[in-house]
Amino acid sequence: MATFILEIGTEELPARFLLELQSELGVRFLDSLQSMGYRPTEVSDYSTPRRLVVCIKGLDMIQPHCEEVVIGPPINIAFDKDGNPTKAAEGFAKNLGITIGSLSQISTDRGEYISGLKVKGGIPTKEVLARLCPEIITALPLPKRMRWGNNPFTFIRPIRWIMALLDSDIVPFELAGIHSNRNTVGLRNNNVPFIEVPSSTDYYMLLKEVGNVILDPNSRKDSILQLGNKEAQLIGGVVNWNERLLNEVIGLVEHPYPLLGTINSVFLNLPREVLLTSIETHQKSFGILDSQGNLLPYFLTVLNMTPPDLALVKQGWERVLQARLEDARFFWNEDINSSFDEWQEKLTHLIFLDPLGSIAQKEHRVSLLCEWIAKYIPTSNAEEARKAGSLSKVDLVSKMVEEFPELQGVMGGIYARHKGESESIATAIAEQYLPSGPDTDVPVTDLGAILSIADKIDTLVGCFGCGIIPTGTADPYGLRRCALGIIRILIEKEYPINLHQLYTRAQDNFVNVSWKLAPEDVLQKLHEFIIARLKNYFLALGYDTLVVEAIVSTQTSQLWSIKDRLDSFILLSQHEDFSQLVQTIKRVINIIKKQDKETEIVLTGHWNPSLFKDTAEKVLAEKLMIAVNKFNQESQTASLPVFMMLLKLQPAINTFFDQVMIMSNDIEVRRNRLNLLKALLLYIESLADFSVLQI
């Protein structure tokens, strides 16, 4: 059995895309080879800043023989009425390389078709890989593409070399003007320009020992953690390992070498967030903490090699960071000597979106929304919420945020605290941009959550009104993130806020705005957009697609109750009588749907008990009223007992169908019975849309 290694050598790849790209490379090779009959024993993928690598073990040297059933044209097209093959059948057989007599008939969901066996295999694996490699590399899903030189080929970064070996044989192909060979490249600035690899089994050893490259990202991570912790222990501290930054640094180095640098103690007077932003975001380094979690005057950076002059490199890193911190100290001193009134005036000249006015106007709208939202949350104070909203954007014109945009909100909270605002208002301002992504927490405080909802819904309504609606992958204003943030807050904080009222209230706060879309169209499109995000949210949590569709389509205003509905519905679906219940409900749906289409009878769901003639319809009406009252007593939250009431209704529904002539000759009796079924359906649809279920 043979081992295949492919190494795509490039200019420095963006660190944030590395792990996804290496995984995609491995998955695509595995899927392609398995579809060709191969059964590799192991597929490994790796990446460094300058290479993507896949290693496949346990390959046959010759592609295994396998048969594939290929479906051709329908039987009535493949043969004429006399049973003679048509040109369609002849062409199909020719494409498969078989005779007409070898064709078979196969039954499918779409009817009767002809089929044939296509035999694959017998090709040398080296030839298979030579064709497969350029196909897979070209088809890799890349977040960005670029061209270089005169070649029309595009990739995420320029390709500089390609090594492709099947055991000791070169797998020959050409891509982007580069021919595959047996050469790899070591660490940049290494004395050896190219490393010849005799066989795929020699690759790892040569790359590490001669090239000085640690190929496996997990090994680089372990090395950084081990050596970094050791450096921090020398000065009695611990490294503040930021997982997101650590994963980025892993993608920036091929041979990690942690270096401990010092910070002038005078800078420790700066806010912790400012220090960490300067260290982590701008220098890609890590802070050092004492045993109490306070920052020490040190930082840890990770070099890409062992430097020839460690002291000189250390001095350079310290000088660059000190310049950053000097700027930060200057901005801090400038900001704390400025007033919020000055900043509020500057906000009037800072445009949010041209049709929507200034940031000052947005801040005012947000403050009004905060006051309105707070009234639905018993633990919050409406006046305090309005105050938090009115100060939410002042830090956008501060010197610190101009220099460090990622600190917006955070600095607003710090400045609010520094200028005497309450702790709750300061915390709310700091939390307003949470959650910043699907994996970050929602605001801890109710006031912060209120401010976050208000800010996000104002942005969504304003952008949709201007016709700025995300399409495809384009979302320059982060509207998907805004929608998901609102969804998560309402669900995780269990706030009883009606979505439609929230949209309308936000829209009403816009004054003298020329909308590109009609106001009612804005609300409709926005609601569809948020519901799509809502469904994706629950699918990501592992809920079944049809279950999500059944529940979400019936309850789109009170998001806080949807998770309980989903869980209750799942428990109901596990009952032994659930399948029969669904069939019964679908019968009700079909009867009402037919009446709506084929008759002029308008069904309202209101019935007249005096028109009941049979006991079965009286019993069904009584059972339905009990279920509806139970639902209303539960404040329409559709808990498990409410869903289980459907099972208690089922016998009455079945008896109604068995004993009652719905389509009575008496038009009034008929209308009354149909309205009873309509009322039943309206109640059922308030719980779930059973029509989407496939049972």
Swiss-Prot record:
Subunit record text: Tetramer of two alpha and two beta subunits.
Annotated compartments: Cytoplasm
Organism of provenance: Lawsonia intracellularis (strain PHE/MN1-00)
Principal EC category: ligase
Keyword Protein biosynthesis in record: yes
MF-aspect GO terms: arginine-tRNA ligase activity; ATP binding; glycine-tRNA ligase activity
Classification lineage: Bacteria, Pseudomonadati, Thermodesulfobacteriota, Desulfovibrionia, Desulfovibrionales
Protein name per the record: Glycine--tRNA ligase beta subunit
Entries under Pfam families matching the protein: DALR_1 (PF05746), tRNA_synt_2f (PF02092)
GO cellular component terms attached to this protein's record: cytosol
Reactions catalysed, as given in the entry: tRNA(Gly) + glycine + ATP = glycyl-tRNA(Gly) + AMP + diphosphate
HAMAP family: Gly_tRNA_synth_beta
Entry keywords, A to Z: Aminoacyl-tRNA synthetase, ATP-binding, Cytoplasm, Ligase, Nucleotide-binding, Protein biosynthesis
SUPFAM superfamilies according to UniProt: HD-domain/PDEase-like (SSF109604)
Enzyme Commission no: 6.1.1.14
Keyword Phosphoprotein: no
